[in-house]
Amino acid sequence: MLNIIVFVLVIVADQISKNLLFNNLYLGQSVPVIPRIFHITMVYNTGIAFGLFKNQTVLFSAISFFVIVLIIFSILEQKRRKDINHLEIFALYLILSGAIGNLIDRFRFGYVIDFLDFRVWPVFNIADSAITIGMVLILIRCIRLFFK
């Protein structure tokens, strides 16, 4: 149940924050929250996470859709097995919610809205954060299995 709640909250928070910024900031506008450390900066990202590989919207939409289907099958397979790993399922739900959040943007706008700007890293969004956290959790799981 927690997985579903987090899944829904990530998508809702991601979309609400992007809509709020889309309606109140213009492209390139940067609002300091903590000057020189953290800004809200409106960026239209036609690439993937953190602005990599720009102007490939159709390709990344197709890849995102494929990844979403793959993750759903992975979650269903995990739940079918008797040795369920809750950390892995939680991580997959995080990645799934982030992928869906960004795919919604690609369908609506043809790009992803990024806005979290820590000034030393490319601008990103809540969906990117969920994907990254999910991947880190899977990496932790893999390291644990490796050293077991």
What kind of feature is each model-predicted range?
Residues 1-148:
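Alpha-helical transmembrane bundles and membrane-interface segments of multipass inner-membrane proteins
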